[in-house]
Amino acid sequence: MTLKTMNDMQEDVDRYIGQFKEGYFSPLSMLARMTEEVGELSREINHVYGEKPKKNEEADKKIEEEMGDILFVLICFANSLDVDLSESFDEIMHKFNTRDKDRWTRIEESEEST
């Protein structure tokens, strides 16, 4: 499997959605779907790392699968609103690197190599 850029992923999702008459859902429906997927990830995290084991009849899902679902919905959401996620990522990293540059205790170079 080849590594894809965010632009590649956005194009792949757009091609996939483009084959259906319905196209992208409305922003409000997309947000509801995102909330649903985050809830499913939360449930899996709780089963794996929390105090609530799965019921015997519950299917095994992987955390990776739930994260993939969230990524797919996020890309659908971005595409429907003409948001370039690569640009959004660059902008948010710039914000964190400037706003929060002194917020956290940095690892010293000697600590990184150990």
Pin down the residues of each PLM region.
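Flexible "arm" and connector segments at domain edges
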Residues: 1-67, 71-114
